[in-house]
Amino acid sequence: MSDRKDVIIIGAGPVGLTLANLLGQYGVSTVVFEGGDELIDYPRAVGIDDEALRTMQTIGLVDKVLPHTVPDQKIRIVNGDRKILAEINPTTREFGWPRRNGFIQPLVDKALLEGLARYPHVEVRFGCRVEAFESDSDGVTATVSTPTGEERVTASYVVGCDGGRSLTRQHLGLKFDGETRSTRGLVIDVANDPIGTPHAVFGGDPSRGYATLSLPHGIRRWEFTLFEGESEEVAEDDAFVFSLLAPHVPDPARLNIIRRRVYAHHARVAEKFRVGRFLLAGDAAHVMPVVAGQGWNSGIRDALNLGWKLAAVVQGKASERLLDSYEDERREHVKAMVALSLNMANLVTDHNRLRTAVRDMAAAVVDRLPKARARLNSQGYKPMPKYDHGIVVPSKLPTWKSLPDREDAPRTVGMLFPQPTVRNEDGKSVLLDDATGQGWRVVVWNNDPTAFVSEVAAEKLARLGGVLVHAVPATQLPWAKAAAAPGVRVVGDESGVLKSWFDERPFSAIIVRPDHVVAAECLAQELDDVLNKVFTVATVTFEPQNA
């Protein structure tokens, strides 16, 4: 049997399923091959951040995901004497969602899988293992071992989302440089949470590091450092497990333990994320220690970055060179997340008493410095995506006399556009992305965008699935809606967040990509020229009918 698809995804984990949902939205014919017979039923990740929740919103599944989360989950880092070294408790909503959330991964994965039922052109096939590939100028043909025999499926592109042991990466012969730490971790999940408090604790105990987290639906997780010489078999040794839990609960023997697993701490990044018609995403491209909670979220960032680009290429709207920007944009941020994860792992798993004593003293100093303490509490140490190259058009600060000299003005190109609550055209309070749509957006403050965008550029934007957005103070919403040109979305800034955001910058027009990254910023009068520059760097290939 032979078949033809636009995209083959290997691996039905969270990254593969998220990417499949994104491609499904774009109408891209996709097949997901998963060697296992069903979704993995044990949670690897336990933290989902605001960026990932925004992605769940993008694919229309956030309402299915939220019931399985603990929003605004505070982390307390303590030493061996239970003294608090630091608190991490970000409470802002820059992107519309809580910034730290506990979650049950298998239930979220299930929501992602069920979401694909919306798309008849997307297929998920379990018990199907890709055994070999053949590539030519027309695409990639995969030989697939299925429960009913061998099949051959051809696609324009293959995305390996098949985990840290990725067969796709191995097929490409790519190095997976980095390190595997000598210490491992033992995960113990318990039903009927015996503690019940909503926060998480990271214990930097030199005798044995640990973490404990409240998870949804009455589940409690513990993670303990295992030392060299302690084998994987200790996970099944009740006496050993109870000895670990004895300092944490009144009676370990009465716990309802539902899961125990040993895992290794890896920190590795693939040599390349793209080789011709093959791409890697998620753990196939990078792995990191679990302590920072960014492995799962980094994979979701990969899917969001890659999805719109793959769709544009296979649908003939952009050159295949657009796919080169995936690695250009994602690699440095991934490396920063790996470094953060390693540093946090070293912080809480170090069992050298001299170093941990120095750590405790340093934490006491930070606690006495308001700015440093606030930065830690607000999670200011977390690297945010910032693309200096790729599908972005940097701009210089304007020098026109009507604009004050603002050398310290925030620069936004390559960073995520915020998502406040706004009023949509019906006057309802909604998140910005729901009011504007999820594709390309040209957002202009207090100005009709059609006055500054030519018909040719507007048609090109529309064929890319983009929209023009007129943002106004909420008081002006009825008037702006009545005066809006056909196709222009009008949003009312009910909270003042958008007005304040534009006020901090000497630009009034913003071009936002489908992954919510700002591609360009400019003055309204410059918009048409800058928009066409964005089309150029995005390798847009079709010409509008009015050209």
Question: At which residue positions do the language-model features occur?
Answer:
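Core beta-strand elements of the Rossmann-like FAD/NAD(P) dinucleotide-binding domain
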Residues: 3-5, 148-157
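Glycine-rich FAD pyrophosphate-binding loop
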Residues: 24-44
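FAD/FMN-dependent oxidoreductases across multiple families
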Residues: 235-298, 318, 323, 340, ...
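Active-site-adjacent segment of FAD-dependent monooxygenases/related oxidoreductases
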Residues: 41-44, 48-115, 215
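A conserved short coil-to-beta-strand element within the FAD-binding core of flavoproteins
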Residues: 126-140
